[in-house]
C-alpha cells in the first residue's frame, strides 16, 4: 500500500486532512467506535439468555447446557436463563428490561434471541467470538461496557443510560458488505423517529455523519461498528451500535435533547428504541438485499449531513501542492463518497483508516 499525506485549510468549509491511498484490495472490514471508559475487567461474567418464542428459548437452554459461549480474554462465563435472572436485576437500578424489549419485538429474524449482561467488557466480542454458536440475528446488550472495540482504539464512553448492543447477520456478496453500516445508521435514525411518533413526542432529528456517526444538534450521540469474517462462502458480519439515550455524558443524549424541547414529556426508553430499530432494520435489510442500496438512497440522503458539502483538497504531486475544490454528491456503488470537482471531474473519496474523524483523512481518486 502506498500513501501520500497532505492537509487542507478551509475558510467557511469544513477542515479536512486528505490522505491519498492506492490499494487494489477490496474493503470488507469497516469499523468505527463506540468504546467505553477504561475499567478493569471482572474475573467472571454473567450472561442472561432470553428468547422471543419457544424456539429461541430452546436455543438458550441448549447453550446453557453445553456452556457454549466464550469470551476472547478467557473470562469465566456464567450462562443464565431469563427465568433464573431475578437476582441480577433490582427494581430501581434501571437495568435493561428484557420483558419490555421482547414485548416490543415484531421481527421474523433479528433481535429474537437476546444476550444481556449488567456489566460487560464488549458486546461486540460476545457476538463475534461466538458467531457460529448463535442464531443469525442474535443481539447482545449491556448496561455498562468498559472495554468497547473501536476504530484505531478510539474511545466512546459507555456509562449507564447508553444503549449498547451488537448483533449478527450473514451476507454472501462481499461487494455490498461495506454498505451495511449505512443501512444500520439509517435504521437507528428511523427508529428514534418512530418511537417519538408513537409516544407523541417532539421529533428528535438524528443525523448521519458519514460513514458511521450519529449526531444531534452538532454533537455526537452514537456510532456504528461493523466487522466481518469470511467462512463457508458467507460473510459473518457483527454489527455494533452505541447510542446515548439517557446519559448526559460524555456529550449529550436523546433524553436531554427531548427535555430541552418539551420539559414535561415522557422519556425515551432503550428497550423501545432497540425494538423499533430491529423492526426498521429488518425491512431495510430485506430491501437492501433484494434491490440494492438504491432503494434506500433517497431516505439516506435526507438524513445525512453532507449533500453539496464543498471540500478543498490539497494533493501533493511530484513535490508540488495542487488545490482542487470538490462537492460531495452522494455515495458511489462501493459505498464511498462521490464528489465532483469544479472541472466536472468525478472523484471517489475514501477514509484513510488512521484518523478519529473520517473527514480528516480521505482518499481521492478519479472515476
From Swiss-Prot:
<dbReference type="GO" id="GO:0009507">
    <property type="term" value="C:chloroplast"/>
</dbReference>
<dbReference type="GO" id="GO:0004077">
    <property type="term" value="F:biotin--[biotin carboxyl-carrier protein] ligase activity"/>
</dbReference>
<dbReference type="GO" id="GO:0036211">
    <property type="term" value="P:protein modification process"/>
</dbReference>
<feature type="binding site">
    <location>
        <position position="220"/>
    </location>
    <ligand>
        <name>biotin</name>
    </ligand>
</feature>
<dbReference type="GO" id="GO:0005524">
    <property type="term" value="F:ATP binding"/>
</dbReference>
<keyword id="KW-0934">Plastid</keyword>
<feature type="binding site">
    <location>
        <begin position="149"/>
        <end position="151"/>
    </location>
    <ligand>
        <name>biotin</name>
    </ligand>
</feature>
<dbReference type="Pfam" id="PF02237">
    <property type="entry name" value="BPL_C"/>
</dbReference>
<keyword id="KW-0809">Transit peptide</keyword>
<dbReference type="InterPro" id="IPR004408">
    <property type="entry name" value="Biotin_CoA_COase_ligase"/>
</dbReference>
<dbReference type="GO" id="GO:0005829">
    <property type="term" value="C:cytosol"/>
</dbReference>
<dbReference type="GO" id="GO:0009536">
    <property type="term" value="C:plastid"/>
</dbReference>
<comment type="similarity">
    <text>Belongs to the biotin--protein ligase family.</text>
</comment>
<keyword id="KW-0547">Nucleotide-binding</keyword>
<feature type="transit peptide" description="Chloroplast">
    <location>
        <begin position="1"/>
        <end position="37"/>
    </location>
</feature>
<protein>
    <recommendedName>
        <fullName>Biotin--protein ligase 1, chloroplastic</fullName>
        <ecNumber>6.3.4.-</ecNumber>
        <ecNumber>6.3.4.11</ecNumber>
        <ecNumber>6.3.4.15</ecNumber>
    </recommendedName>
</protein>
<dbReference type="InterPro" id="IPR045864">
    <property type="entry name" value="aa-tRNA-synth_II/BPL/LPL"/>
</dbReference>
<dbReference type="Pfam" id="PF03099">
    <property type="entry name" value="BPL_LplA_LipB"/>
</dbReference>
<feature type="binding site">
    <location>
        <begin position="122"/>
        <end position="124"/>
    </location>
    <ligand>
        <name>biotin</name>
    </ligand>
</feature>
<keyword id="KW-0511">Multifunctional enzyme</keyword>
<dbReference type="GO" id="GO:0042966">
    <property type="term" value="P:biotin carboxyl carrier protein biosynthetic process"/>
</dbReference>
<dbReference type="InterPro" id="IPR003142">
    <property type="entry name" value="BPL_C"/>
</dbReference>
<keyword id="KW-0150">Chloroplast</keyword>
<dbReference type="InterPro" id="IPR004143">
    <property type="entry name" value="BPL_LPL_catalytic"/>
</dbReference>
<comment type="function">
    <text>Plays a major role in biotin-dependent carboxylase biotinylation. Catalyzes the addition of biotin to the biotin carboxyl carrier protein (BCCP) subunit of acetyl-CoA carboxylase. Can also biotinylate methylcrotonyl-CoA carboxylase. Is responsible for most, if not all, biotin--protein ligase activity in Arabidopsis. Is essential for plant viability and required for ovule development.</text>
</comment>
<keyword id="KW-0963">Cytoplasm</keyword>
<feature type="domain" description="BPL/LPL catalytic">
    <location>
        <begin position="105"/>
        <end position="289"/>
    </location>
</feature>
<keyword id="KW-0436">Ligase</keyword>
<feature type="binding site">
    <location>
        <position position="145"/>
    </location>
    <ligand>
        <name>biotin</name>
    </ligand>
</feature>
<keyword id="KW-0067">ATP-binding</keyword>
Amino acid at each position: 500500500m502506498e500513501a501520500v499525506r497532505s492537509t487542507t485549510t478551509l475558510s467557511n468549509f469544513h477542515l479536512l486532512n486528505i490522505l491519498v491511498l492506492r490499494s487494489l484490495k477490496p474493503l470488507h472490514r469497516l469499523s468505527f467506535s463506540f468504546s467505553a471508559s477504561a475499567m478493569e475487567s471482572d474475573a467472571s461474567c454473567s450472561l442472561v439468555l432470553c428468547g422471543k418464542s419457544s424456539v429461541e428459548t430452546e436455543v438458550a437452554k441448549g447453550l446453557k447446557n453445553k456452556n457454549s459461549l466464550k469470551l476472547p480474554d478467557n473470562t469465566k462465563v456464567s450462562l443464565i436463563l431469563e427465568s433464573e435472572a431475578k437476582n441480577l436485576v433490582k427494581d430501581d437500578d434501571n437495568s435493561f428490561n428484557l420483558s419490555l424489549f421482547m414485548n416490543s419485538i415484531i421481527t421474523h429474524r433479528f433481535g429474537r434471541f437476546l444476550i444481556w449482561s449488567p456489566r460487560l467488557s464488549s458486546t461486540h466480542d460476545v457476538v463475534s467470538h461466538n458467531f457460529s454458536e448463535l442464531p443469525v440475528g442474535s443481539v447482545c446488550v449491556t448496561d455498562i461496557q468498559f472495554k468497547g472495540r473501536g476504530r484505531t482504539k478510539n474511545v466512546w464512553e459507555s456509562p449507564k443510560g447508553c444503549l449498547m448492543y451488537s448483533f449478527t447477520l450473514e451476507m454472501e456478496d462481499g461487494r455490498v458488505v461495506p454498505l451495511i453500516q449505512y443501512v444500520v445508521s439509517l435504521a437507528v435514525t428511523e427508529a428514534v423517529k418512530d418511537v417519538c411518533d408513537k409516544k407523541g413526542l417532539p421529533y428528535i432529528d438524528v443525523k448521519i455523519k458519514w460513514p458511521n456517526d450519529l449526531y444531534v444538534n452538532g454533537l455526537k450521540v452514537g456510532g456504528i461498528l461493523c466487522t466481518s469474517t469470511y467462512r463457508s462462502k458467507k460473510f459473518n458480519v457483527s454489527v455494533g451500535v452505541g447510542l446515548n439515550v439517557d446519559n448526559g455524558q460524555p456529550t449529550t443524549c436523546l433524553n436531554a435533547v427531548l427535555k430541552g424541547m418539551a420539559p414535561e414529556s415522557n422519556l425515551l426508553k432503550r428497550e423501545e428504541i432497540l425494538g423499533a430499530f430491529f423492526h426498521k432494520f429488518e425491512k431495510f435489510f430485506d430491501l437492501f438485499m433484494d434491490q440494492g442500496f438504491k432503494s434506500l438512497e433517497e431516505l439516506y440522503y435526507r438524513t445525512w449531513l453532507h449533500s453539496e458539502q464543498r471540500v478543498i483538497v490539497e494533493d501533493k504531486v511530484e513535490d508540488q501542492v495542487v488545490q482542487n475544490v470538490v462537492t460531495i454528491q452522494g455515495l458511489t456503488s462501493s459505498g464511498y463518497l462521490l464528489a465532483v470537482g469544479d472541472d466536472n471531474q468525478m472523484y471517489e473519496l475514501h477514509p484513510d483508516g488512521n484518523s478519529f474523524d473520517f473527514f480528516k483523512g480521505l482518499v481521492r481518486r478519479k472515476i
